[in-house]
Amino acid sequence: MSQPEPLNTQRCSPPPKRETLRVMFGRIAPGYDRFNTLLSFGQHHRWRRFAARQCRFPPGGLALDVGVGTADFALEVIGKTGRAIGVDPCEPMMRAGVEKLCRRGARERVLLVAGEAEHLPVAGDRFDCATTGFTLRNVTDIDQTFAEMARAVRPGGRVVSLEIAKPRIPGFAPLFFLYFYRLSPLLARLFGGDVEAYQYLPRSLKEFQSREELADSMRRAGLIEVRWYDLSGGSVAVHVGTKPG
């Protein structure tokens, strides 16, 4: 495996969008988990559990989590016996993740590495699965991200994405959009969150790919047996693809 980049290593200046997002997520890192629970009414735990089951992760296996953040998804995937490497460009988020890993007694089984989703600092054909949760809306190149995740997993391994989606159920979709675009920033303001960040998150969905487009992106990365599952009325989608071999 290539040498991971230490958390305190100086990097070249990233593109403006990347740097802006890195700073923004750094600001919300201390309260990120709390606001996830608040804004999703606690459903994000159920979503991750479902997505983790799609990984078909073997006992004692090795997982890769892209956009690891505070390590919730990685912990869900690896269970009590697995190991993981988590990659994220935001050091404050990973510091919050390290604190959580220590509290859960999993610090020795999960390595957090500074890096970008489009250029993962890991060797190929190495991981039993690669996951990403609520990250793709923030990357600069989704095709390249999936290509890197596909490169990293061993033949037969799965790539799994968990993301916010646009509901298609008549009657529910307008209610979701009202909540997501209008009420969630208001809740952030009322409960002392970063209003700018929680205004960005709804905006990011407007320009995000459809389910079909994400599936096509997986296929362009060489993944097969691509499919998706809608959760919570279609407000969340889990995409799954398999590396041939």
Q: How would you name each of these model-derived features?
A:
Residues 224-245:
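Core SAM-dependent methyltransferase catalytic element
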Residues 158-187:
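Conserved class I S-adenosyl-L-methionine
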Residues 62-119:
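Class I SAM-dependent methyltransferase SAM/SAH-binding core
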Residues 1-31, 180, 191:
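N-terminal, positively charged/glycine-rich alpha-helical extensions of SAM-dependent methyltransferases
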Residues 143-155:
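A short glycine-rich, Lys/Arg-flanked "PGG" loop and its adjoining helix->strand segment in the class I
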Residues 118-129:
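A short acidic, Gly/Pro-enriched loop at the edge of an enzyme's catalytic core
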Residues 41-61:
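Conserved alpha-helix/loop element of class I SAM-dependent methyltransferases that forms part
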Residues 32, 130-131:
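Hydrophobic beta-strand segment of the Class I
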